[in-house]
Amino acid sequence: MPISNFIKRKLAMAFYLFDRDKNGVLEEEDFVQLGAAVANLQGVPAESERYRKIVAAHRGWWDAYFKGGDADGDGKITLEEYVANVDRWAATTPEPIAAAAAGNELVFDTIDANGDGTLSADEFSTYLQAYGLTDADARTAFAHLDRDKSGSISRAEFAKNMAEYYLSESRGPSEWFYGGH
């Protein structure tokens, strides 16, 4: 079954946030720049191992989730290619939300700046500011995504929210992952 317009809108919002140079397509360099922005906003020195890991994780996100959707092999992903790739992946993956949640836990470590296993409002805000959101919008998103209202987002909450953002037809907290739409 093709994905709905609701999910297409969420995918489009994420697509335009990932497009760091605003050229209308996603390329590997967008993810390198995104990783660098996350590290810089966290105050991680550019020559450090943590900086390299953050950039590598975002480059890995390109390799794992985006590169395979390049239908014409030009090294660029259009919005149409992106939506078609997510649709194809969701249709052919058993338990797609659970599978996506498992993969999304890898991103968590790049955001968890203090390594305590949870995301604070400050850490999550810094992450979303790398995408271009304001601190206020990021904190509003955090309030929605902190499902148990503990004041932090656990690894499981993060992975579930991100997976549901991309794949769930249901309205709820996950639609706030990138600041609402």
Role assignments for model-derived ranges:
Residues 2-6, 56-57, 97-99, 131-133:
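Short helix-capping and inter-helix turn/linker motifs at the boundaries of alpha-helical repeat units
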Residues 27-46, 77-92, 118-132, 154-168:
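Amphipathic regulatory helices of Ca2+-sensor modules
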Residues 8-23, 52-74, 101-115, 137-155, ...:
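Primarily EF-hand calcium-binding motifs
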Residues 162-165, 173-177:
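C-terminal interaction modules of eukaryotic adaptor/scaffold proteins
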Residues 1-6, 61, 86, 91-93:
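Extracellular/periplasmic low-complexity linear segments
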Residues 2-44:
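The feature marks the first
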Residues 89-106:
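Short, structured interface segments that constitute the first stable element of a domain
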Residues 45-53:
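Conserved GNAT-fold acetyl-CoA-binding loop/helix
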